[in-house]
């Protein structure tokens, strides 16, 4: 009887452990995302607030219908408009830092959700921070615009909805409607959507050995891209490379930083790459901790390498003088 009682107790404890395992994994993931958001907030609020003030100082935003029409008249205009609205909150750096923290959390969570939809094991959750870390590196450039982050979020949301469509006709209709809308609203990040569709459909077709169908989908996507670009060129007289939406992500439209294309590529392929990593159900917390420490060790010097603290100091001084001048003017 004592042996049977011990066996029952062991079975109960094992069942409790099995039931608690998903909860503990969820808590670990939530904790990592919250820690990520807090780190981003502290950086922009304490370490790099001058860059937020610089953006707010040299931007004019109007709640005006004519201004809205002017902004959305170009590819990526909606992302530009939304980002310019959000930049107004940079006037108070704590609000600007909060905005950025929320946006960066959104980038990481959407990356993970897309990877999870491809079957990525929970153990690789820390690796979903990689694209967002690259965006952080890029945003330390004072000429990098917030519209890039907004456009990335738009595109990742479009990708996520696509993963729930299981019939080819629904997917085809979704692409035909969403692709031109996304190109116009988000700009060049539509290339992530395009790449996601191509990789997803090729994977499905090759798994079913429908090679010609896969090639046809690739040709169709490039034809859709060319058609949309041609229609845009009729309305907007800009170079072809700008008609893909590379207009509002950087302060100088004629410049397309390599980092933009690197980030676009990273968001496109990483969810699929994570799903191809080896599966393991043992020592999950240990592996997650090791990945997290490796990310910190790599990202810390990586982020610092993109910071220019001389410019940061100059921007902070300039902003302080500007506000002091405005205060004296108001007193007079």
Stretches found by the model and what they are:
Residues 320-327:
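Conserved small/polar residues in nucleotide/adenosyl-binding loops
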Residues 57, 72-76, 96, 100, ...:
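Membrane-interface micro-motifs in multi-pass membrane enzymes
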Residues 43-103:
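Membrane-interface coil-to-helix junctions
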Residues 29-52, 220-229, 294-302:
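Transmembrane signal-anchor helices characteristic of membrane glycosylation enzymes that use polyprenol
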Residues 166-180, 211-215:
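Short hydrophobic alpha-helices at membrane interfaces in multi-pass membrane enzymes
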Residues 214-276:
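Membrane-embedded alpha-helical segments of integral membrane proteins
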Residues 14-40, 275-286:
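Start-transfer (signal-anchor) and selected internal transmembrane alpha helices
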Residues 280-319:
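Hydrophobic alpha-helical transmembrane segments in integral membrane proteins
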């Amino acid at each position: 009887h004592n042996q049977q009682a011990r066996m029952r107790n062991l079975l109960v404890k094992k069942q409790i452990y099995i039931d608690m395992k998903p909860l503990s994994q969820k808590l670990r993931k939530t904790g990592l995302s919250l820690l990520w958001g807090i780190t981003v907030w502290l950086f922009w609020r304490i370490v790099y607030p001058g860059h937020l003030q610089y953006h707010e100082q040299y931007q004019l935003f109007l709640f005006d219908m004519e201004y809205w029409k002017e902004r959305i008249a170009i590819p990526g205009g909606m992302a530009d408009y939304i980002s310019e609205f959000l930049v107004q909150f940079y006037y108070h750096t704590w609000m600007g830092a909060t905005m950025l923290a929320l946006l960066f959390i959104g980038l990481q969570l959407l990356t993970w959700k897309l990877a999870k939809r491809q079957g990525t094991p929970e153990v690789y959750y820390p690796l979903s921070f990689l694209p967002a870390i690259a965006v952080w590196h890029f945003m330390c450039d004072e000429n990098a615009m917030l519209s890039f982050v907004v456009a990335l979020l738009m595109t990742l949301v479009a990708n996520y909805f696509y993963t729930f469509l299981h019939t080819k006709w629904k997917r085809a209709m979704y692409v035909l409607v969403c692709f031109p809308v996304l190109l116009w609203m988000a700009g060049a990040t539509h290339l992530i959507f395009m790449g996601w569709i191509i990789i997803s459909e090729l994977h499905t077709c090759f798994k079913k050995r429908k090679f010609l169908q896969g090639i046809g989908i690739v040709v169709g996507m490039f034809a859709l891209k060319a058609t949309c670009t041609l229609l845009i060129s009729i309305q907007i007289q800009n170079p072809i490379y700008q008609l893909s939406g590379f207009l509002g992500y950087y302060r100088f439209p004629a410049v397309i930083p390599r980092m933009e294309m690197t980030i676009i590529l990273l968001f496109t392929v990483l969810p699929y790459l994570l799903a191809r990593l080896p599966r393991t159900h043992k020592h999950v917390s240990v592996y997650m901790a090791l990945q997290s420490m490796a990310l910190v060790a790599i990202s810390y010097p990586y982020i610092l390498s993109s910071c220019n603290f001389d410019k940061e100091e100059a921007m902070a001084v300039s902003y302080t003088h500007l506000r002091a001048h405005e205060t004296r003017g108001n007193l007079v």
